[in-house]
């Protein structure tokens, strides 16, 4: 099921969603239509939406399995969170991410480490989940690793 095999290490992409984000002009300072025209043969329709002109980004984690540990790199957007700047992420109720993690053969209790590359909302959202009105760790047996 691994997307990549590096020796005896398996790496699997765990997708939460494909999301339209911003236009190339909004994201890249100085980006011009001519720059887009030079690359539209491979950007359309999978990386840029033909209808909106927005970039299509995979919101995903990487599941890393070694002989000794099960590691999750980033935890996507999550559910029941409040986001003012990305309305589509506000108060989501979709458990696709957890279902995809289980489809990859891992239960949240089996994660040993969660590596957070940085603390943007689309990288740490599933660090916690709402359960019976309380925020609890989604990966209760994991050690969470952050940079200083």
Where are these regions (language model features)?
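Metallo-beta-lactamase
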Residues: 1-102, 110-122
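Active-site flanking residues adjacent to catalytic metal/cofactor-binding acidic residues
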Residues: 73, 117, 146-147
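Short acidic/polar capping segments at secondary-structure boundaries
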Residues: 78, 119-121, 144
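Short acidic capping loops at alpha-helix termini that bridge into adjacent secondary structure
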Residues: 108-110, 141-142
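Metal-dependent catalytic neighborhoods of phosphoester/phosphodiester hydrolases
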Residues: 124-134
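Short, conserved loop/helix-junction motifs that constitute active-site signature segments
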Residues: 133-141
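Short internal beta-strands
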Residues: 140-148
């Amino acid at each position: 099921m691994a997307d990549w095999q590096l020796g005896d290490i398996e790496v699997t992409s765990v997708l939460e969603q494909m999301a339209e984000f911003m236009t190339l002009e909004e994201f890249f300072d100085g980006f011009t239509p001519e720059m887009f025209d030079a690359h539209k043969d491979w950007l359309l329709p999978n990386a840029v939406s033909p209808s909106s002109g927005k970039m299509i980004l995979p919101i995903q984690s990487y599941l890393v399995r070694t002989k000794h540990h099960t590691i999750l790199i980033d935890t996507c957007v999550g559910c029941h969170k409040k986001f003012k700047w990305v309305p589509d992420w506000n108060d989501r109720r979709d458990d696709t991410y957890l279902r995809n993690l289980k489809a990859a053969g891992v239960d949240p209790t089996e994660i040993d480490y969660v590596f957070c590359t940085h603390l943007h909302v689309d990288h740490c959202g599933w660090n916690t989940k709402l359960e019976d009105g309380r925020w609890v760790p989604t990966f209760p047996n994991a050690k969470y690793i952050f940079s200083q």
